[in-house]
Amino acid sequence: MRKHFKGAKLCFALSLSICLTLCGCEKKETKREIKAEYTLEQLREESKNFKAEYPNLDLSKTKIIIPDGDNIEELIFPVDINIGESEENFEKVKNNVYENIRLLTGKDKVEEKYVKYSACEKEVLLKDVTKEDRMISLIGTPEHKEREKERNIDPEESKSAYGFMIGYSDGDYSTLLWGSSFMCEFTNKRVSGTWKKKYYEAGHRPPDDNIVRSIDISKDSIDDVSYVLDGKEVPLKNAIEYVEENIGKTGYHYAASPFLTYEVIHVDVIKYGGDKYYYAMELKALYKGIPFSSDMYAAGYPLEGEVDYEIFSETHHVSMLAENSMDFIWSSANNYEEKKEGEVYDKFLSIDDAMYLVSNAVSSSTTLHCDRVELLYRTEFHKDSTYYCIKEVQCHPVYQVRCVNTGLPDYPVLFFNVDAITGMVEGMDTLI
């Protein structure tokens, strides 16, 4: 299983100037006693007039966000989609995908000629394999070992088989499920007219190379934003309301979770096919009003020690090519169908303690400008050690600190996650 280490990895990927900026290259001792002893109500009060100062952090323009409520539940979501485990599990996942296909196409019967199975073993992609080949490719049978020998694959290495794909594409509709990242896509290609390629010829997503307007929902007004979609004027505000209300009501497996709500955070208006437009929306997931980490650059690694899980940040994507129509859905790791009970926390580190820990992880020779500090959920992949498929996703409360105007050309934005219970500090995945 993948392990994440502190400074050696962090320093390896950075230029010397960046290495000198972050911890792992400059060791500091934490002298303050850190305890999780503050209620959410106390944190909300602390956030109102936060005036603490740190030698290497500029908080003059920092927005601090603390959720409502009295506690935060640690979330545990089983993800039972490892089709390499057994024939029974394979059939369960296959049946769910076939239900999706029937719902997507509106047909009672799935046309098998349009269904494809693929497997990934490390960087080896097996295309167009049968169900039997699929099982052999993931289970350590004699046939599997013989195939490894023929393809010159180390048997020990191939145990890290991490991906599978079940896909469908008939030219009008396509859908696929990836096991390695618990990602599912649904595409209705009929709307655009100019966009009718099979998945295996590429083009399974709407064309996105002509963005005419990019909108940050948290900052930009959308009151007057309106474009013609498939011959009809559709105000963006109406489109967003429809998607947020209906993304969880599609009936598809792996498209959204009944335990979560979703909010649009970004929209690109895209022109395609000459003079046609559509809305490409990015959504974040929330549990009882508390958001999941949604910035792809905010995934991290502990700056001290190691862990046996993978930290990640994910969003949903929905494209609307016609009014009240979700013509492309991309979901990944925020689409759980089951939930287990987790620990409920009602005491947390103070905001001051969290920022102190970040300051302690940053070189005293630099100053980082923090524009946002938010108490939210950080998500973790827990993967099977044999097939490297996701077995469980855990969501844990952290302070996420975003730093802007870093002065680093390749990294204008930096993120730190501070565990709101233990104080463990994580640095950015993109720096590793």
PLM segments and residue spans:
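Segments that shape or occlude catalytic/ligand-binding pockets
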Residues: V228, N238-P409
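Preferential activation on post-signal-peptide N-terminal prodomains/segments
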Residues: C25-V307
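Sec-dependent N-terminal signal peptides of Gram-positive bacterial secreted proteins and lipoproteins
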Residues: H4-K28
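Short low-polarity hydrophobic stretches
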Residues: N100, Y399-V401, G423
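A short, surface-exposed interaction/processing loop segment used at functional sites
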Residues: G171-D172, L176-K219, Y227, I311-V344, ...
